Structure formats: structure tokens, C-alpha cells
Amino acid sequence: MDILKNGTIIDQFPIDITIDDIKNKYFKDKQEVVIKQISKEDQVGVVNGMWANMMGHGGTLPIKAKFFPCDKFLDLKLTGLQEQVMRESMHVAETLAWSLTTDEEKKKIQDKYDTADHKSGIHIHTGDGSVKKDGPSGGAAITTVLYSLLTGRKIKHEFALTGEIDLHGEVTKIGGLDSKMLGSIKAGVTSFIYPKENEKDFKTFMEKYKDDKVIEGISFYPAGQIQEVFDLLLV
């Protein structure tokens, strides 16, 4: 930075740096972070997951799913630079989502997407395709988006959720809850689902922000089982 390279300036204290200096001089060649707003309508196969990083930043991660023609029924196509743990979570989510459909729903899906001359798999895409993503905390969201696609039920757009998932449908503990929620509020989320196992973290969050306008009108729901998530999220 110029201010560090110029010895005649660095010896003068205090140093005054304005917001205008930061935007138009020192970081003029840097891209400004733009918070993408969530969708304004309920949709099938679209859910707001959540993310957080080690720097304390967080926000929403749109996760979308659609059927696509392929050689193997319900084969998964994964795009969006998911790393190994997240990809494994997607396979767990698919097994769970399929197991939760009724026999009647399974038959309808197979009659349409698993015929002799036409088979379909599921394409799952996570937003911000150029950014690597990993971790198991999107499991509940991925299960929900797959169940939505399989059953044709829409997902409420104002919700975001986080939580690891297992094959028995248990929603389990994650990290970075406060960063995920604060960033997602900026993106327009007004309702959150988080793991019951994170209740201590949630209480700490509420103690810190209970008098802050940032959480005015925001609803929070703990969940321990994926069915609780479905009951809240699905139209």
C-alpha cells in the first residue's frame, strides 16, 4: 500500500484513512463483495443452505436439484466444486430422501423416470460454482431439496437451514452457526432451522443479539429429525 511505502507519510501520526480512500485508492482494483438475495418464490428443488468460513464470514448457499437423462436411474451428477465430504453427504441425502417417499410415490417416480427407453438421474448444483465447498453441514438441506424433487413439493423460500444428516434422519451438530445466520439475514432470510444439538450455540447467539435490530422479525426453529425439517419447510 502507498501509505506504507511512503516514509514521509508513515512518520506522521495519527494517520487518517477515509472510507473513500479504502474504496477508491487502496482497494480500487478489488471486487466489492455483493450479497446475493434469496429467491422471492417457493420452488420445487431449490433450498437455501448455509455456509461459514474460518474468517467468521457466512451466508446462504443455494442448492438446486433437477432430473436429467442418463443411463442409470437416480444416478447423481454433482456440480459446484463440492469436495469429498460434501459429495458423500449428498449420497447419504439421496438414500435417505428416497427411503422417506411412500410406495405410491416411488411407483410414480419409477414409472416416469425408470423405463426401458428412458432413465433419469438427479443433478445437484451448489451456487457460486467457482468456489470450493466442503463439510457435512449441508446434509439436511440436500435431503430436503431431493425429497422436494422426488415428491413435487415446493420449499418455502424465506427459510434457510443447516445441519448434518445421517441415514436414520437425525439432524446433528454443525459449526459456525452465528456466522451462518448473520450472513443469511443480510441475504433476506427470515426463518432459520438449526440442529437441536446446537442449542447452546443458539443461546449464546441470542444473548449477544437479543437487543439488536438485526434479528427483529426473524424466526428460529431447532430440529432433531429430518421430518421436523420437512414439516416446517415444505408447502
Predicted regions: what is each one?
Residues 1-5:
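C-terminal helical "lid" of AAA+/P-loop NTPase domains
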Residues 9-23, 28-48, 53-235:
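Peripheral, non-AAA+ core regions of ATP-driven protein-machinery
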